Amino acid sequence: TSRCEIMKLLFIFTGGTIGSTLNGEYISTDSSKPYKLLDEYNKKYGIDFEYDAIQPYTELSENNTGSTIRALCECVCSNLTKEYDGIIVTHGTDTLQYTSAALGYVIGNDSIPVCLVSSNYPIEHPKANGIENLRGAIRFIELGNGRGVFVSYKNPDDTIKIHRGTRLIASQAYSDSFYSIYDTYYGSFDDKYNFTFNPDFSESTDQATPLPYSKLNERSNEILRLESYVGMAYPELNADTRYILLGSYHSGTTDTKSDTAKEFFKRAYNLGIKVYITGASRGADYESTKLFDDLHISSLPEA
C-alpha cells in the first residue's frame, strides 16, 4: 500500500482464546470480544486503516472440524479478489497449525497476505500476546513483505515472528510457544516493528494448483492418524480406512522391528491402505528407516 493510500483490511473473527472471556474459572467465547480486540489495539497503536469485519462462526478452536475449516476456507477465498490489501483471521491456538496449513494449501503462495492471529490468554490478561500478534500481522500486511498465508506470533521473551502457514508446528504441551519446521520462520520484527526476512528461510514457487476444499467433511473417516509410542498397540483396520498418517519419533523413526508392527503394516498394505509417516526428514539414516520401503511406508516432505 502506498503512503497516499489508506490500507483496507478484512477481519474474519472465528473465536478462540483471542475472542474469549474468562467467566469465573472457565474460558468461553464472547460475541462482543472481536470488537474489544480492535478497541484495545486502537488504544495502544491507533487505527490508521479502513476495515470490514465478518464472523462466519464463533468457536473454541479445539472444537473445530473439517466442516469448520471448510467454512473458513470458503469465507477467505470468497474475499481474496475484493478490494482488500490483506485479510486477518483471528483463531484459537489449539488448532492453529491445522487451519494455517489448510488455508496455505487451499490458497497457495500468490494471493494477498492472509495472516492468522491468536492469543495465549484472553486479551485482558496481563500475559496475553494477542494485541502484539495483531500488531505484527497488520504491520506485515502494511509493509507488503509477503503473499499467501502467514501466522504472526510472539513467544514469551521473544520478538514477533512471521511464520509461513504451511510450516507451523503445533505448540508443545504446557507451552505457549510456536515454531516453524527447523525453526525457519519467514521473518521477524524488532521492538520498533522493523521487519527482517530470515536468511535461512527458503521455499519454491507453487508446484501444484491450490487444493480444493469443498470435499472437507465433518470427520476424516478415511484417514487414521497414529502417533508412535513405546509398546504401541495398533488398532484394527477396516475397509473404510484409505490412509494412515503416522507420526514418528523426533528423529524420524518408528518401530519397524516388532512382529506386531510388521503385521500391522502388512495388513494395511494387503487392504490397499497407504501409510505415510511424518517427521522423517530426507537423509535420515537410521536402521529402522531403511525398512520403510519393505513395510510400504512412505515419508512425507516437511511442508
Q: Which residues does each PLM region occupy?
A:
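Short, Lys/Arg-enriched N-terminal segments with co-localized hydrophobic residues
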Residues: 1-6
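Active-site histidine-anchored catalytic micro-motif
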Residues: 7-234, 238-303
